[in-house]
Amino acid sequence: MTDTSTTARRIVFVTGPSGAGRSSALNVLEDAGFEVVDNLPLRLLDAFLDVPSSAQPLALGIDPRNRDFSTTVIVDALGKLTGIPGLAPELLYLDCSTEVLLRRFSETRRRHPLAPVDRPSEGIVRELEMLGPLKARADVLIDTTHLNVHELRAEVEHWFAPGGKRRLSVSVQSFSYKRGLPRSVDMVFDCRFLTNPYWVPELRSLNGTHDLVKKYVTADARFEQFARKVDDLSLLLLPAYRDEGKSYLSIAFGCTGGQHRSVVMAQCHALRLAEEGWQVSIRHRELDLRKNEET
C-alpha cells in the first residue's frame, strides 16, 4: 500500500467486471472531491499523467471493454507512479460473483459487452480472466456481490473520502455453511459445535440478534472460552496486520443456517473489538439475504 497521507496526491485506478459497480464507485469518488476521468484510452495514459496538475485527487475509470485494454500497461503505470514523490497511486477493484453478475445483466436486459448474443456467461468469464492480474494487484478490493448501491457508497466513502490517513478497518460477518464461505475473507471460525437454538421451537424463528437467542447460545459451557480465545487471537493479530500496512481485514463466523450461533458470535466479537478501539463494521449475510428477499 502506498503513502496516502494528506501531502500526497491520490491517484486511484478504478476497475472491475461490467456490472460490479465501477460507474457507481466513480460517482461516489466525484462526490468526495476527486477529479474523475472515465474510459481514458490507455495509449493516452502516460501523456495524461505527465501533465502538471493541482493536488486534487484523481480517479481513473479503467474499462476492460476498451480496445486497447492491457493489464500490463496499468500495472506498469502503477509501478511508475509509486516511485514519484508526492503521488499516492492505488488500485480499487470492484469484484462480484459470476452468478450475481449474470443475474444483474438478466434483470437489466443489457447485453454483456464481451459476450456473443444470448450468451452473457461467456462474456463474464472472459472478462474475469482478463482482469485477474489487476484483482491480484488491487490495493482495495470491494466485493459488491451482496451490496446495494447505498452500501457500496458507504464502502467507497470509507476508503477514499477525505479524513486523513486510513486505519485498519475490520469487517465481521456471519454466514451459513450451506451457502458456502464468504468471498475474500481472511479468518474463518466454525461455530457449529455450539448448542443449536434451531432445535428449540420457540427460538427457531428468531435470530442471533434477539436477546433470547443470545442468552441460549452464550449459556453453552464452551461459549465463553471459545469467545475469549477468538478475541485474544484477533487482538494479537490486528496490530501486526496494521503495522505491516494491511488496511482491511475480514473475519467470518459460520454455522449451519447462519441465523443463530454465528450471528451471536459475530455480534459479541465485533463489540469486543470496538471496545478495544478498532474500527469495526458488521453484517449478517443470511439475515441480509432474507431481508432482501422479503422486500
From Swiss-Prot:
Keywords: ATP-binding, GTP-binding, Nucleotide-binding. ATP binds at G16, P17, S18, G19, A20, G21, R22, S23. InterPro entries: P-loop_NTPase, RapZ-like, RapZ-like_N, RapZ_C. GTP binds at D63, P64, R65, N66. It comes from the Bacteria. GO terms for molecular function: ATP binding; GTP binding. The keyword Mitochondrion does not apply. Pfam families: PapZ_C (PF22740), RapZ-like_N (PF03668). Belongs to the RapZ-like family. Displays ATPase and GTPase activities. This is Nucleotide-binding protein RD1_1380. It comes from Roseobacter denitrificans (strain ATCC 33942 / OCh 114) (Erythrobacter sp. (strain OCh 114)).
